[in-house]
């Protein structure tokens, strides 16, 4: 097989052993498609690798190329920044759950918010200590919930980057979606596991007779009841991606998908807190304010509720619908000049209703029996992201100096709104009266207060009556009068990857200019706040090849990010965050006879004008302040192959991320894990009756304390740390002439229980059995 790097090419996608399940309906679709398309090509076909794509011919857990660092296909060792690649084979082996779990084995990432939180955005993550809200899909901002079935690989870029406009300084997550494979065919698989977990999944590529058109059909169905008192979720995903070669030098592409989730909002009402008077300064009383914390109301994670706890009931709902559309066009003017356009639209509509007993407080009427009041909420959020990107790549030489120049423009528009949020609380006299009126008219019995003794005595609160969504919409008051927010961002950027000294040294220089407009409107369409601004940012990095196997790299950059915070006194929007970052380190490949590769990096990031605004469940208001933050640390990533059939991936990070300045000084940043270690390994039997059997597993160890909230009043709500083990096995065989792969995954093998992120716990031990058939 020949491998060429050409300006325009057919994307190559890796066919691993699919672990998720495909729907029977889509099998029929694929079978129908296969009558219209015929396989074309032989094993000697030339594979052309596009400068805009990153699929590799080789498989495995390691990767040698990236597109996220420079905007074009580039060797990882030539990029002057830390980039971690999660390959499709690693995803197949390690992933049971969702996109969140796919990132568990990156040592610099932790989840910071709960899933199903009643907002249109996915879970936020902490990267190098900073909360990250910018999830990219194929290099384009506007990340909503990403179904695992869409993902071909994930690239995590550490630190700010001039390519991506309003990026967070800790880094960004770029999801590379699946495109049609070079060869026709695919897989269908089925699975079943604990907690009534079932699923079906299909992934099939069809190609036209002349090989110009490729279509990839994707489908995924999952359903499970969960392991909590009331839990469970059903997911249905349908997707189609395609490429078409208009000419030898011009190719179009698209992807369309719809992902629907229904179930109980368990992660929205899973865990709880308690207020315990604490003598923080050791003076013998609990009446002082110590570093912003009132001793009488010191708040901690709950100490008495069982791990199966959930305060929602069967009358609560979670319903989310996410739609994706991406179109692209590439054209090659010559071997050294390529242009690409990509347009993306993401729409989401999410509705959730929940009953929550959030914080248990001291009970003056019955000391020792803490009490919590109910919060019954219905909310709907809708978000639309539309992004258009145009990139022009030009390669040229000036004497002995080689250039890879990227010129780009990105237009991003976001509209966020929805039908609002409505709530009725048992602890509010006026709202309790409305609940009592609904009860009188319907015969429902509502629980206004929950006591510690109720939990300890096993009261079945999950069987309680709750207001229906229509009752909350009809009788509750809307929490706020905001209608929609609009964000319009224009980004111009230029990067040049310059190679000197016979390619022994390369410098990456970049500049980015951003113009943004933000506006929010009240109900009725009246504009209540607006903000305009612009900024120019720079990036400068370099890679020096010490020898063929070891490279030194360094990178400095600043970043600029609009934010949604408003001054509570004036209502005016607060200006953007700014940040400066520096990192340096070593990248090494093929050490010890080609067995060891990896990287080590040190970094420092400073971020200013940070709106620290977190919902406070005690007051049901937002605590807000403007601070400065700083994070520094060391990261190590290793890929080791003791033998050809044994792979080990290990990573470690030490991160010291705290608030600096005059407000909340010394508070650790939310989700920042001081020490985090991950390891994943697999071993393939290469001889004997079990030839082909692949076994492995991984461990994730996080050392606390891990801050759960970003405000000072909740500084004692922390996770002490945890260790989780996961196992898997795959066995390929033949049934007649049909290739079949059997699999088993055990997630959280020791059934460890911990608070994964703010008010959300991890999943209980899960067994998943799967069978996959090649089509």
What do these predicted ranges mean?
Residues 50-183, 584:
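Acidic, small-polar-rich N-terminal luminal/periplasmic segments of exported/outer-membrane proteins
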Residues 332, 338-344, 348-356, 576-653, ...:
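Membrane-embedded beta-barrel scaffold of Gram-negative outer-membrane proteins
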Residues 504-507, 604-606, 625-709, 750:
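Gram-negative outer-membrane beta-barrel transporters
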Residues 203-229, 233-241, 245, 322-332, ...:
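Surface-exposed extracellular loop regions of Gram-negative outer-membrane beta-barrel proteins
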Residues 38-39, 377, 381, 393, ...:
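Conserved C-terminal beta-signal and adjacent last beta-strands/turns
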Residues 245-247, 383, 402-421, 426-432, ...:
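Structural signature of Gram-negative outer-membrane beta-barrels, strongest in the C-terminal barrel
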Residues 222, 226, 241-245, 249-332, ...:
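Acidic/polar loop-and-plug regions of large Gram-negative outer-membrane beta-barrel proteins
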Residues 150-152, 162-238, 246-250, 323, ...:
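Outer-membrane beta-barrel translocator/receptor signature
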């Amino acid at each position: 097989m020949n491998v060429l790097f050409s300006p325009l090419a057919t994307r190559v996608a890796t066919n691993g052993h699919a672990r998720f399940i495909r729907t029977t309906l889509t099998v029929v679709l694929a079978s129908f498609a296969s009558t219209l398309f015929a396989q074309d090509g032989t094993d000697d076909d030339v594979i052309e690798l596009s400068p805009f794509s990153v699929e590799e011919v080789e498989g495995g857990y390691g990767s040698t190329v990236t597109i996220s660092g420079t905007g074009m296909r580039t060797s990882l060792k030539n990029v002057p920044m830390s980039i971690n690649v999660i390959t499709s084979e690693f995803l197949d082996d390690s992933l049971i759950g969702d996109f969140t779990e796919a990132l568990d084995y990156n040592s610099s990432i932790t989840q910071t918010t709960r899933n199903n939180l009643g907002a249109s955005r996915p879970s936020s993550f902490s990267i190098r200590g900073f909360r990250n809200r910018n999830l990219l899909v194929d290099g384009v901002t506007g990340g909503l919930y990403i179904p695992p079935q869409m993902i071909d690989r994930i690239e995590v870029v550490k630190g700010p980057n001039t390519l991506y406009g309003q990026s967070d300084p800790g880094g960004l997550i770029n999801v590379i979606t699946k495109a049609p494979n070079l060869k026709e065919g695919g897989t269908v698989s089925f699975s079943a596991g604990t907690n009534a977990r079932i699923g079906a999944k299909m992934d099939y590529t069809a190609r036209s007779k002349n090989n110009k058109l490729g279509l990839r059909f994707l489908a995924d169905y999952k359903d499970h009841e969960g392991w909590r008192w009331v839990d469970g979720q059903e997911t249905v995903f349908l997707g189609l991606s395609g490429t078409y070669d208009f000419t030898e030098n011009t190719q179009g592409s698209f992807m369309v998908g719809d992902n629907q989730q229904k179930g109980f909002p368990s992660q929205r009402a899973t865990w709880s807190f308690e207020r315990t008077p604490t003598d923080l300064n050791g003076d013998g009383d609990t009446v002082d304010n110590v570093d912003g914390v009132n001793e009488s109301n010191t708040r901690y994670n709950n100490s008495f509720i069982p791990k199966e706890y959930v305060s929602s009931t069967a009358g609560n709902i979670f319903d989310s619908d996410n739609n994706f559309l991406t179109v692209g066009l590439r054209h090659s003017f010559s071997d050294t000049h390529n242009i690409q356009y990509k347009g993306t639209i993401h729409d989401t509509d999410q509705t959730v209703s929940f009953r929550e007993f959030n914080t248990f407080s001291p009970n003056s009427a019955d000391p020792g029996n803490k009490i919590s009041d109910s919060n019954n909420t219905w909310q709907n959020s809708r978000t639309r992201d539309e992004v258009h990107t145009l990139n022009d790549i030009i390669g040229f030489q000036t004497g002995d100096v080689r250039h890879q120049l990227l010129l780009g423009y990105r237009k991003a528009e976001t509209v966020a709104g929805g039908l609002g949020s409505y709530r009725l609380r048992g602890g509010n006299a006026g709202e309790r009266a409305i609940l009592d009126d609904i009860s009188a008219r319907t015969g429902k019995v509502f629980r206004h207060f929950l006591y510690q003794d109720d939990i300890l005595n096993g009261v079945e609160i999950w069987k309680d009556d709750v207001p229906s969504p229509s009752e909350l919409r009809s009788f509750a008051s809307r929490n706020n009068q905001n209608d929609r927010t609009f964000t319009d961002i224009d980004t111009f950027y230029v990067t040049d990857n310059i190679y000197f000294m016979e390619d022994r040294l390369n410098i990456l220089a970049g500049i980015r200019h951003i113009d943004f407009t933000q506006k929010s409107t009240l109900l009725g369409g009246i504009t209540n706040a607006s903000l305009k601004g612009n900024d120019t940012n720079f990036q400068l990095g370099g890679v020096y090849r010490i020898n063929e196997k070891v490279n030194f790299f360094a990178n400095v950059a600043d970043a600029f990010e609009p934010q949604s915070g408003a001054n509570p006194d004036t209502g005016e929007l607060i200006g953007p965050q700014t940040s400066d970052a520096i990192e340096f380190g070593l990248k090494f490949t093929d050490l010890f006879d080609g067995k060891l590769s990896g990287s080590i990096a040190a970094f420092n990031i400073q971020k200013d004008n940070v709106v620290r605004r977190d919902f406070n469940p005690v007051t049901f208001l937002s605590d807000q302040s403007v601070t400065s933050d700083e994070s520094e640390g060391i990261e190590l990533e290793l890929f080791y192959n003791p033998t050809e059939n044994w792979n080990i991936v290990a990573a470690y990070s030490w991160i010291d991320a705290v608030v600096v300045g005059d407000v909340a000084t010394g508070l650790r940043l939310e989700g920042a894990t001081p020490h985090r270690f991950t390891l994943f390994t697999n071993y393939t039997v290469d001889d004997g009756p079990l030839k082909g059997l692949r076994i492995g597993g991984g461990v994730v160890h996080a050392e606390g304390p891990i801050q759960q909230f970003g405000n000072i009043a909740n500084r004692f709500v922390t996770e002490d740390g945890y260790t989780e083990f996961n196992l898997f096995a795959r066995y390929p065989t033949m049934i007649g002439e049909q290739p079949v792969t059997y699999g088993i995954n055990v997630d959280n093998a020791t059934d460890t229980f911990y608070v994964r992120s703010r008010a959300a716990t991890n999943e209980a031990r899960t067994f998943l059995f799967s069978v996959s058939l090649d089509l």
